[in-house]
Amino acid sequence: MSHADKYNILYPFQHGFRKFSSCETQHIEFIDDVIQNLDDGKQTDVIIMDFPKAFDKVSHYLLMHKQEHYGIRGMINNWMESFLSGRTQAVIVEGETSTYLPVDSGVPQGSALGPSLFLYYINDIATGLDSTIRLFVDDTIAYLVIKSNNDALTLQRDLDKLAQ
């Protein structure tokens, strides 16, 4: 993550797998915002999401392009592409192994690189959204001060974009 930290690449409200950040810091910042809004007499609507199988759904092709966009090029990007490509998987049931099939998406969980690769992949999640988005890896809190029906529609549009 030193490249991401050195060049200040990662989304500032991403609290996962980062120095001095945690699930607790995500929650503290969120709660602080909501309490401030309550003190100011403002309504805050909140949506809390967890994207199922998020690590498994990472497109290798898109991840490589995103890393290149963030300045990871040349040998390192080639090495990471090699790390992800050529993987296969099978299922074993009662001692019988299925046919091995290629794995074209996902980052290897339990690997040292998996979390960093995932953070690069999800880094642009809040682009084009009007709500505040706070992340702990893929655990997402989206919220917005609601002053009118238009604000509620804005939050709904952001939810629709996040669901894509």
Feature-to-residue mapping (PLM):
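Short, surface-exposed helix-loop/turn micro-motifs enriched in polar/charged residues
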Residues: 9, 43-46, 132-133, 151-154
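Conserved pre-catalytic core of RNA-dependent polymerases
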Residues: 1-108
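Hydrophobic alpha-helical packing residues
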Residues: 34, 51, 87, 125, ...
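Hydrophobic alpha-helical membrane-association signature
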Residues: 30, 117-121, 155-162
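Short, conserved phosphate/pyrophosphate- and ester-handling motifs at nucleotide-, phospho-/glycolipid
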Residues: 110, 114
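Catalytic palm subdomain of template-directed nucleic-acid polymerases
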Residues: 53-70, 141-164
